[in-house]
């Protein structure tokens, strides 16, 4: 590939509004009983299609609001989270959407905020303040963003008791003058240029084998700072036949089936469990139950059966 081809490819990736799709973490692709159509149902622009047991994202229709990433139970849809995490840190827990007036760190749409991002920011600053524009007429996310954001906050509180305040309009603070506005715009442009390449998602082949998705790493980091957590986990009851179904449908490889001597043993990596319920729905004898793990179990691998 020539230099110009590489430059064009990098530009196209940088301007593509779609989240990255990892089919190996998609419940539809995994053939989980009941499947999954949450991303299809939440997309305000009809940019999501479910075709051939996988998710297809329309580059033209997608606005990059991020709502699909928040509802995906297997973290199969994701944006690079490092830049948003840094913006929350620079803003000391304050962030605005791109349509909110005033100054401060910004993200394209508050729909891109995940439970992990909110919980991790809360573990640093205690309170997170978010400013939104007029979602009802916004062409990026639309009127469902506030409700969806509230659900993300509730999920985030499983990992850290974060307090979140959402305001419409400017972030609390002094109004910005003309000179300060120009400096803020200039600084924003410089940051955008500097962060453009680092913000690109890694190709699937570049991910480290066995590494948790970024969203789960943020949740785990927040949980390590919390007094107590309600991390999702599963329990296997009597009647398990040690078949491989639960391991096959698990989107994050949280469940392992290991041969030990003449028998198989099931293990759960708690930090990798999202509580998606794929194993619960797909278990042939229906002996798997969803529970909550305390803080001390989050970093453990537990024997299930």
Residues covered by each model-derived region:
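Extended, charge-rich helix/loop segments that form flexible
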Residues: 185, 191, 195-213
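A structural signal for short beta-strand/turn segments enriched in small hydrophobics and glycine
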Residues: 36-39, 43, 68, 72, ...
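A glycine- and small/hydrophobic-rich beta-loop-beta segment
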Residues: 213-219
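Ferredoxin-like iron-sulfur electron-transfer modules
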Residues: 8-35, 46-64, 82-85, 171, ...
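Catalytic cofactor-binding cores of redox enzymes
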Residues: 164, 176, 180, 219
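Flanking helices and flexible, charged tails adjoining ferredoxin-like Fe-S electron-transfer domains
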Residues: 1-18, 23-24, 28, 67-174, ...
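N-terminal secretory signal peptides and thylakoid transit peptides that target proteins
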Residues: 170-196
